């Protein structure tokens, strides 16, 4: 059940980039707003909002900012009409890329995403062009120090799909999309406090890159993540730890 996470190095790099750019607050304000709009302002009956609240608090966002974002989403002001969009395309080396965005102007966002793909040697595709290469999964992450056998046993009892041991000693528990919240709650009740928990698009195949290809793909991912309307970027790029170290 346990294995090595091929995509962990890119995920960890993304976390560093997010922190450096200070984009975290903007991302979670949007998520809080949309979650409240779709499922209501009560986190007890809105699991997506409950997860967003946990993320926002974990990013040290003030309760006042959180409350205002939730109130905005629960209101009826049409000027606050933020919608969720996804874009699909191929980057250099044939790497499949999925982009998730939240925007109040889809034309602006589409133009910016297309420009990033074109500038970095990729191609923005049509709906469905790469989505079949990804699965929507729950990912629950635990910091190093967790007892592996106990975590695996608890994960199996909670009907998790997989437990992945990373090189740094951390663990990722993967779930189906529909069972994410149930598994997360079961692990928490079993005494395992997650360092992070999120819904992700996990690639079902990988595209291995050399250093030149990796540099080009990471440039595209960085450019996409820098866009104000972009929430998440996923790829099926497989980059060795050695190349990641060389690229910093």
Swiss-Prot record:
Disulfide bonds: none
GO BP annotations listed: regulation of DNA-templated transcription
Signal peptide: none
Gene3D superfamilies membership: 1.10.10.200, 3.30.70.980
Region of interest: Disordered: 1-21
One cellular component (GO) term of this entry: cytosol
Chief location of this protein within or outside the cell: cytoplasm
The keyword Transcription is annotated on this UniProt entry: yes
A Pfam family: TACO1_YebC_N
TM segment ranges: none
Protein's cellular compartments: Cytoplasm
Keyword tags: Cytoplasm, DNA-binding, Transcription, Transcription regulation
Example of a GO MF term: DNA binding
Stated family: Belongs to the TACO1 family.
Protein name: Probable transcriptional regulatory protein PP_1214
